[in-house]
Amino acid sequence: MLDSDARLASDLSLAVMRLSRQLRFRNPSSPVSLSQLSALTTLANEGAMTPGALAIRERVRPPSMTRVIASLADMGFVDRAPHPIDGRQVLVSVSESGAELVKAARRARQEWLAERLATLNRSERDILRSAADLMLALVDESP
C-alpha cells in the first residue's frame, strides 16, 4: 500500500467515524440502539427476511441478530410470521411502529446533514455526492 493510500484510508476512516457519531446523536431519545435501528432500517428498506439473512446483511453473528430481533419484537417494532415455504424458519418484518421509528430517525439525520451541506458550495456538494457513491460501492462490494 502506498503511503498516500494509507493516509487516505486513515482520513476516510476518521471522517466516517466522526460523521457516524454526529448522526448517532441526532435522535438521542430513540428507544433503540444503533444496531437495532440498523436492523430495522434494513427490514424497512429490503422487506421481510429470515433472521439468518438479516444477520448476513447486517454482518453480525446469528445469535447476536436473534437477540436484536427479540428485543425489537418485545418493543413492538418488528413482526414475526411463519416462513411460507420452510416451516422451520420465520420471517421478520418491520411493524408499523417500527417503520415510523425508522422514518423519524432518518428525518432527524437528514435534517441535520442538510443543514451542514447547505454551508458548502455546489462544487463541494458534487464532490461529496461522488465520494458517497464510491464509498457505498466499496462497502457493498466488501466481503
From Swiss-Prot:
Phenotypic effect of disruption: Knockout mutant is hypersensitive to bedaquiline. Deletion of the gene does not affect sensitivity to capreomycin, pretomanid and rifampicin.
Alphabetical GO biological process terms: response to antibiotic
A GO molecular-function descriptor: DNA-binding transcription factor activity
Transferase recorded as keyword: no
Quaternary state and interactors: Homodimer.
Note on domains (UniProt): Contains a winged helix-turn-helix domain connected to an alpha-helical dimerization domain.
Name of the featured protein: HTH-type transcriptional regulator Rv0880
